[in-house]
């Protein structure tokens, strides 16, 4: 179905700036180079914000290498320990880095008066599941152990992520609940990747999702690399990799979920939000008409409004 007429006019330039590509092993190097360039540009722009950006390292263990972190904190002095926002970047699990959305992280740190910490987690296809989520959990535990040094309040940890990072955040919320790890005040999920079964073809799937930016072919490539050697859609996929597989969603933190109406992930995100509600989790859901994947990575009114709502939800989550 031709969905271009459904795209908000202000987002049409995005379709020219980010050409839609069906990802494959051959296309992956070029995709990574594009995100590396975008990350560099975003990091340069971040220097205009009244924040301090710092790169830290969690030392290697017997089972994992050094883990690099990007931290962002307001430049102004704190009068008390700040809340902390754990951010997980997007990029299909096989590309990206914390600097990819550095300007947004600066805005979060500034508007929420919090410390933002984003790990440079291991990527597929070299490091399939569970490498990324274990890196995310390692970061969460490191935050609580180093709260005094970081000047943060370990009882006020929020979680956010976009796209693959949103799926990783949802998986981390499940994992830390089941491991009785550090408590989370909220999960703020932006067009999260949640369900590997979308690769198998579903007759009731939205006919308007996935034409632009992130396609069904790219989605299949992503899930295949993440779950290797397990086949996407098979019975033994972990809910920590595909949170939609979880049967028990109770006792998860209050959730804010945002997705565009033209995003490939619309159906799985709506289904997840509904199941959270049915199991007693507080949920706010934003569906953005005329918006495709990564719409919020643009300098447009619709992106500004969506990010403002996201920040407002996190303020309430932190009790601000």
Residues covered by each model-derived region:
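A glycine/proline-hinged amphipathic helix-loop "lid/cap" segment
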Residues: 1-74, 232-233, 301, 305, ...
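Short beta-strand-to-loop junctions in surface cap/lid or active-site-entrance loops
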Residues: 61, 69-81, 244-249
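Short beta-strand element of the alpha/beta-hydrolase
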Residues: 81-91
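Short amphipathic alpha-helix adjacent to the substrate-entry channel of hydrolases
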Residues: 99-119
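Alpha/beta-hydrolase active-site loop
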Residues: 127-149, 310
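Gly/Ser-rich "nucleophile elbow"/oxyanion-hole loop immediately N-terminal to the catalytic nucleophile
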Residues: 144-159, 179
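Alpha/beta hydrolase fold serine-hydrolase catalytic domain that processes acyl esters and thioesters
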Residues: 154-156, 170-320
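Gly/Ala-rich beta-loop-alpha elbow adjacent to hydrolase catalytic centers
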Residues: 161, 165, 169
């Amino acid at each position: 179905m031709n969905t271009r007429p459904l795209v908000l006019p202000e987002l049409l330039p995005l379709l020219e700036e980010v050409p839609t590509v069906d990802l494959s092993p051959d296309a992956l190097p070029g995709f990574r180079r594009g995100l590396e360039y975008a990350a560099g540009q975003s990091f340069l722009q971040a220097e205009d914000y009244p924040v301090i950006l710092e790169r830290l390292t969690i030392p290697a263990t017997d089972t994992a290498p050094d883990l690099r972190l990007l931290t962002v904190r307001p430049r102004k002095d704190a009068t008390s320990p700040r809340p902390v926002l754990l951010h997980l970047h997007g990029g299909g699990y096989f590309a990206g880095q914390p600097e990819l959305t550095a300007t947004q992280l600066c805005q979060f740190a500034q508007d929420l008066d919090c410390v933002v910490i984003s790990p440079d987690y291991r990527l597929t296809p070299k490091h399939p599941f569970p490498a990324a989520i274990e890196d995310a959990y390692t970061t969460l535990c490191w935050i609580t152990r180093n709260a005094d040094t970081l000047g943060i309040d370990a009882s006020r940890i929020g979680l956010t992520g976009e796209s693959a990072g949103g799926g990783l955040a949802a998986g981390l919320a499940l994992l830390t609940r089941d491991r009785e790890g550090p408590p989370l005040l909220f999960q703020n999920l932006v067009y999260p990747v949640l369900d590997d079964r979308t690769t198998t073809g579903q007759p009731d799937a939205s006919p308007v999702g996935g034409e632009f930016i992130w396609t069904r072919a790219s989605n299949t490539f992503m899930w295949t690399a993440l779950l290797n050697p397990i086949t996407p859609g098979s019975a033994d996929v972990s809910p920590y990799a595909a949170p939609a597989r979880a049967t028990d969603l109770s006792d998860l933190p209050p959730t804010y979920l945002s997705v565009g109406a033209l995003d490939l992930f619309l159906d799985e995100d709506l289904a997840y939000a509904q199941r959270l509600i049915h199991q007693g989790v507080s949920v706010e859901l934003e569906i953005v008409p005329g918006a495709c994947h990564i719409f919020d990575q643009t300098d447009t009114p619709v992106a500004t409004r969506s990010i403002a709502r996201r920040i407002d939800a996190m303020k309430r989550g932190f009790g601000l």
